[in-house]
A protein has these predicted regions:
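Ferredoxin-reductase
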Residues: 2-95, 112
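FNR/FR-type flavoprotein reductase catalytic core
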Residues: 4, 84-133
Length: 133
């Protein structure tokens, strides 16, 4: 993964909280209160952690919300440091470079019936899909 975020902008951690054992959610907002670029359900953002690592995190809020992005990060003791840096070191008010939303997990609007299955932290893109229905 590249260390350079294309079209990056700096967002502020507006609020964070532990939502489950080892999982912390982060609300990212524009420091000036401006609207954020739109995203579609299932999208993710690239984010530079406090330690400098660039990682992808699924957006889990409703795509109609333009005032914030919400991600959830699971602390991974055996990972390469991205999740540890966010979960352990990031504090509300911190500024983080973030790339624009991307989506490789689009839901078909033509589908008549949906069965959404997820486990563990894999629920994050599914939450956005559910909220968009």
């Amino acid at each position: 993964m590249s260390d350079i975020l294309e079209n990056e902008r700096v967002l502020r951690i507006g609020r964070s909280e532990f939502v489950a054992d080892g999982i912390r959610s982060f609300e990212l907002v524009d420091p000036a209160g401006e609207s954020l670029p739109p995203f579609t359900a299932g999208a993710h953002i690239r984010l530079r952690t406090p330690a400098g690592a660039v990682r992808k995190y699924s957006l889990c809020n409703d795509p109609s919300e333009r005032h914030r992005y919400v991600i959830a990060v699971k602390r991974d003791e055996l990972g390469r440091g991205g999740s540890l840096s966010l979960v352990n070191d990031a504090v509300d008010g911190d500024l983080l470079p973030v790339g624009p939303p991307e989506n490789a997990f689009r839901m078909s609007r033509a589908a008549r019936n949906l069965l959404l299955i997820a486990g563990g932290i894999g629920i994050t893109p599914i939450l956005s899909l559910i909220r968009s229905l």
